[in-house]
């Protein structure tokens, strides 16, 4: 799959206002995923055989350097890559301790304008 098409689908499915794509010009065949800050693990993803790395935050220099190494990078935002797991964590907490109150909290303080 084309990296730009894949990144667009990631954006749509996560509900992110935008994603950043460093397109290495290679098709998306194997994706490594890390929610939140993932800039330190790009080389590990590449060593594991990924041609595309999706994370919440990668950093400017990581993104500008990676395409030269033949790897597509997609930065989709901390909130948007971590939010999908919150309901799962809530269910796990309730399974461990059914009588424990466990509410989801979403901060709306930061917005892309």
Question: What kind of feature is each model-predicted range?
Answer:
Residues 1-113:
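Hydrophobic structural segments
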């Amino acid at each position: 799959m084309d990296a730009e098409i894949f990144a667009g689908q990631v954006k749509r499915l996560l509900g992110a206002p935008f994603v950043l794509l460093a397109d290495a010009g290679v098709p998306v065949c194997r994706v490594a995923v890390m929610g939140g800050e993932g800039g330190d693990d790009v080389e590990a993803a590449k060593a594991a055989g990924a041609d595309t790395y999706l994370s919440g935050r990668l950093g400017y220099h990581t993104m500008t350097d990676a395409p030269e190494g033949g790897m597509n990078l997609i930065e989709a935002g901390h909130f948007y890559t971590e939010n999908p797991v919150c309901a799962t964590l809530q269910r796990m907490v309730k399974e461990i301790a059914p009588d424990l109150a466990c509410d989801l909290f979403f901060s709306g303080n930061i917005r892309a304008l």
